[in-house]
């Protein structure tokens, strides 16, 4: 059984999420200790438990230690159970983070099209917003042959949650590698600024701040607005945020986002997202840093060698590489490349569950 120190590297829930996915795919059981040991609220929290229980349902796994605050967990996967699933995180726990566990599995198992109905948080701190999944991650996974459709039914913000998302995944069968080491020419920049249970001007100001910042750099984004009339807002809220993305002539998308919070001016929210997107564009990296670490488990399972660049070698990227190497006999290297970081992945096909 593989043993993982949950305090390694970035020491967060990503270690568990990646391990769950690769355990199901390879059939290798694991035990993780010191789960989130260096966090202010150590151990498993509700959104981590949601990932564990969803992974266990899909794989008929035997699980020990799945309770709030648990510092260790044993996971022994069985056979993958194909079908559609409803998952209720039960809090404002991030839907996007639960998807980080499930998407690699559904991308490669022979289950045909699978639909997930997930309730929880769509726009919450320390997690990719659902718009990043919809407009950036789903697009980039399509380059590998994975079909993902994300339908946002209702947003859920911290602390009330209540967001609803329907995700349909059509597996690739065999994942295609990605070889993109430069950003390339931009086809366009788009965005979505939203505000729920808040005045419409919040969404407008977020968008304008992002547009103003990018315009000074010679970039012309097209940012859509999402807000609701008082009395016709179906969300629990309140909350706001903005997601920006750019598509390259090389085919890939880069993204950036910022979340509103009490006392934070809407202008700061919009500008933060614009600054983050501009940093990737100025560096000429093929992918933003968040996408860079998300791609690791997928490309480690792909049919062939992959190369791509990111702006920085983050702790999340290094940690994901370490976890992948525990489950897959893949050769993954990082190196400095034209003031960027190049990631090279040479997969050695691992056994896959039917």
Curated annotation (Swiss-Prot):
It is an enzyme of class 6 (ligase). Its EC number is 6.5.1.4. It is found in: Cytoplasm. SUPFAM superfamilies: EPT/RTPC-like (SSF55205), RNA 3'-terminal phosphate cyclase, RPTC, insert domain (SSF52913). ATP binds at residues 100, 290-293. It catalyses: a 3'-end 3'-phospho-ribonucleotide-RNA + ATP = a 3'-end 2',3'-cyclophospho-ribonucleotide-RNA + AMP + diphosphate. It comes from the Archaea. CDD domains: RNA_Cyclase_Class_II. One of its GO terms (cellular component) is cytoplasm. One of its GO terms (biological process) is RNA processing. Keywords: ATP-binding, Cytoplasm, Ligase, Nucleotide-binding. The active site is at residue 316. Pfam families: RTC, RTC_insert. One of its GO terms (molecular function) is ATP binding. Catalyzes the conversion of 3'-phosphate to a 2',3'-cyclic phosphodiester at the end of RNA. The mechanism of action of the enzyme occurs in 3 steps: (A) adenylation of the enzyme by ATP; (B) transfer of adenylate to an RNA-N3'P to produce RNA-N3'PP5'A; (C) and attack of the adjacent 2'-hydroxyl on the 3'-phosphorus in the diester linkage to produce the cyclic end product. The biological role of this enzyme is unknown but it is likely to function in some aspects of cellular RNA processing. Belongs to the RNA 3'-terminal cyclase family. Type 1 subfamily. This is RNA 3'-terminal phosphate cyclase. It comes from Caldivirga maquilingensis (strain ATCC 700844 / DSM 13496 / JCM 10307 / IC-167). The lineage of its organism: Archaea, Thermoproteota, Thermoprotei, Thermoproteales, Thermoproteaceae. The gene is rtcA.
